[in-house]
Regions:
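Acidic/polar-rich alpha-helix caps and helix-coil junctions
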Residues: 1-188
Length: 188
């Protein structure tokens, strides 16, 4: 049901030179703050958590239908193969294509939504926020968060750093940056 050849190429970064990158970090590629896919995946997760897999599935399939138009990649990768066919509830049943480890169907669905948020949110704040949120309450469906050249068991980054301009000009900002490892109130 899924062919991610084009997305993989779009996300591949040539670290030896900046000028040859024509995908996610191409110099004119938009860096979105809020997106259609993010909103649909929020709706998918919340509908499933507050109801059932069947309640969330249409929202996930909306994202897949949009991706099947090539909306998630730029024109440099439209000629590469991609396919995002709609899921059905059986795909999340024990032994289904999205549940090879036999967890309950709803958890398998939520895990797929979180994985899609992780991949689609590449370069955005979504994976970072999901990592903090799910580590506390739903580690069984969280995407493993690996720090390159960093500790694998903590401390984990808890917040984004404050910009110096924010600290200097915003009267609501703390007197000094507390650092990325200081837990926010919601994560204590």
């Amino acid at each position: 049901k899924t062919d991610e050849t084009a997305r993989k190429a779009y996300y591949t970064i040539n670290s030896s030179t900046g000028s040859s990158n024509s995908g996610i970090i191409e110099e004119n590629e938009p860096q979105n703050m809020v997106t259609y896919f993010e909103n649909q995946l929020i709706l998918a997760e919340s509908a499933a958590r507050n109801g059932s897999l069947a309640d969330g599935l249409p929202y996930l399939n909306n994202v897949r239908a949009w991706m099947n138009t090539g909306g998630h990649i730029n024109s440099n990768f439209q000629d590469q193969s991609y396919s995002y066919l709609a899921y059905d509830a059986a795909d999340f049943d024990n032994g289904g294509i999205e549940n090879t480890d036999g967890i309950d169907s709803k958890s398998a669905f939520l895990r797929e939504v979180i994985e899609e948020r992780y991949v689609s949110g590449f370069g955005m704040h979504i994976p970072y926020n999901d990592s903090r949120r799910l580590r506390k309450s739903d580690s069984s469906i969280a995407v493993p968060y690996v720090l390159v050249n960093g500790p694998q068991s903590g401390p984990w980054p808890e917040r984004m750093p404050y910009a110096t301009t924010e600290l200097n000009s915003n009267s609501n900002a703390p007197a000094e940056d507390p650092g990325i490892f200081t837990k926010t109130r919601v994560n204590q």
